[in-house]
């Protein structure tokens, strides 16, 4: 497989060229392919979260254990209803304060979310990124993008497209090169299936 690498900036998103690049990447996702893209934390390796075959490809490309859940990326609160079975009131307050941004929340999943995406668990991890390129891609790719960091398991999380290319070229359909990412650490994880919610992971 030849991996396509396209440079894109936030300023290009509303141009014809930018729309064409995002559209092509979105089509790859809708067809069950893999696209690496920038978020505000690290580069993510995206697939259609509701397509079990696509999610399986992420594990194969990364060499990731299949019981390690993937985070589902969305762009609006309305999208949460389709994938989260029970959304406690406190989740809306937390989302209002911290989304979009580097916070992942865990909910009981609906039947829409395949076990291939959740690592066999009955819960789903959800994040709403603030990066404009990521958000444009999620919308173009169907609204639900499963995306761990875009690297072979065990390697450092990538903060530049060059890192992704060195690691995953030939294994994925496309890399969106949006330059260096802002934070370079992965998101805080908050479990919303317990009361009160519990922090499971917080970057050092």
Locate predicted features.
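Active-site-adjacent structural elements in enzyme catalytic cores
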Residues: 1-204
